[in-house]
Amino acid sequence: AAAQTRSGVVGVLATPGTLSSHRYASLMARYAGDIEVLEDPCLGLVQLIEAGATQAAETRDLLQRVVVPMLAAGADTLVLGCTHYPFIRPLLDDIAGPNVTIIDPAPAVARQTRNVLQQRDQLAPATRAGSLCCYTTGDAARMAALTADLLGVQCRVRAVRWTNNEVIANTREEATDYADFTD
């Protein structure tokens, strides 16, 4: 974003957790330099997306309350700081207009995921299709419906718990699935 901005002002749409993380602070210290970074925790946006309200008036209103002040302050580049936010990209494009660059870090995350899988020799061979299994700390049935709605794919969804910074499977089958996924 720092390399893309022409005005020297960048808006970051993220979650409170991201904005308060050490990783985010490290990235800001490393790359922001003289760039003015405007941050917003976008309270409620993840919940709206998870409710399937990606085109709803309420979602548009929230985005306008966040983005319009950033644009008024000179932001010409917006960064999507949450994996949920690409699902509301059409609304963002409409609100921000054609002269604002929107940076979606998902391709970089995908490349890093591929690198990690290659390093661990867990990348599926290109000669066969991979499979998709999603893990959620929420309701598995709801996650399956969201995956179908937002991604247009059917996939197996397993419920897990997040305890003491560790993923805990809820059943023996899920433990096996998760172990296969992480080993």
Name what the model sees in each region.
Residues A1-T171:
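Non-catalytic structural scaffold of enzyme domains
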